[in-house]
């Protein structure tokens, strides 16, 4: 086949290396975005996808590498408010979440990770002062956390200890925190909520939303498509609900905090105002639904 563009040639060369296994590659699961330690061939399975909270696609497990992703995908950026930038991959890859870059006078924090880290992203973040640390909400968003740490001088990556068994690439950059709260910087605190995963975490930014406070909830507390309510799930794709006890624990973790705005896990999943009261009412609605309140509605 004749290649007419340089990009097609680069893609063909990348495919050839991937298929022949001539170099050790750190393979990435195409379904969940998790990167595995370098190996001659793709892993036989992805435990993250085999768990009931995720899934193996109908066409089966498939794998890629960071090098291949850099050819076929790119990252885009969105300024949400002063000091907060969303970073997401186009076209959509794996789960499709976006990361958040939080810029503060005390230092910058990357909240959650996406699989693709490219030159444009590194340049943007370095231009804004680099990273003080990375913090991740739960195992579905661990992705290429080691690559992100290395790109910014081996910054620490903070994960809740309750989810330690899900780490696929053990590394010195990983720092496990325990308990219910962990202060990353002045005014930036990790909150343990549990729910989706035992170590499910959220981030509270006291100065966000013009000083009213922001919670970055990932999919521990999911901003629904109507942006008027929250959902809480053990598995989102497989529609496995949480218990009332687990959902009330998420609400109880957040209620003592001052916040008016919530950023969930995708670009459009934002509760711009009134989020604290809406979260409170969403917890009660969930409890009522689990208890049978809507059985005859």
What are these regions (language model features)?
Residues 86-133, 171-173, 179:
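Pre-active-site segment of Zn-dependent metallo-hydrolases
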Residues 25-44, 51-55, 68-82, 107-117, 132, 146-199, 239-255, ...:
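Metallo-beta-lactamase
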Residues 15-23:
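Short, Lys/Arg-enriched N-terminal segments with co-localized hydrophobic residues
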Residues 84, 97-99, 198-202:
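Short hydrophobic/aromatic beta-strand or adjacent loop that forms the aromatic wall/cage
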Residues 118-159:
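Active-site metal-binding motif and surrounding structural segment of the metallo-beta-lactamase
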Residues 25-92:
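N-terminal juxtadomain amphipathic helix
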């Amino acid at each position: 086949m004749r290649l007419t563009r340089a990009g097609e040639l680069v893609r063909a060369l990348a495919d050839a290396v991937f298929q022949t296994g001539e170099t050790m590659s750190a393979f990435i699961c195409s379904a969940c975005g998790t990167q595995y330690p370098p190996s001659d061939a793709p892993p036989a399975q992805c435990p993250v996808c085999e768990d009931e909270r995720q899934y193996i696609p109908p066409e089966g497990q498939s794998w890629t590498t960071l090098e291949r992703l850099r050819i076929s995908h790119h990252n885009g950026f969105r300024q949400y408010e002063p000091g907060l930038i969303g970073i997401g991959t186009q076209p959509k890859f794996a789960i499709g979440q976006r990361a958040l870059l939080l810029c503060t006078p005390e230092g910058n924090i990357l909240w959650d990770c996406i699989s693709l880290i490219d030159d444009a992203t590194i340049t943007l973040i370095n231009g804004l002062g680099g990273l003080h640390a990375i913090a991740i909400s739960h195992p579905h968003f661990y992705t290429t956390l080691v690559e992100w740490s290395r790109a910014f001088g081996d910054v620490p990556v903070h994960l809740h200890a309750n989810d330690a068994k899900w780490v696929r690439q053990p590394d010195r950059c990983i720092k496990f925190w325990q308990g219910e709260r962990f202060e990353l910087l002045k005014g930036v605190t990790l909150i343990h909520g549990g729910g989706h995963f035992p170590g499910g975490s959220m981030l509270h930014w006291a100065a966000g939303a013009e000083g009213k406070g922001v919670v970055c909830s990932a999919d521990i507390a999911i901003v629904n498509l109507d942006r008027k309510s929250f959902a809480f799930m053990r598995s989102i794709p497989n529609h496995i609900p949480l218990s009332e006890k687990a959902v009330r624990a998420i609400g109880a973790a957040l209620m003592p905090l001052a916040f008016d705005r919530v950023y969930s896990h995708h670009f459009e999943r934002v509760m711009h105002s009134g989020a604290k009261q809406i979260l409170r009412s969403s917890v009660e609605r969930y409890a009522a639904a689990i208890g049978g309140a809507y059985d005859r509605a």
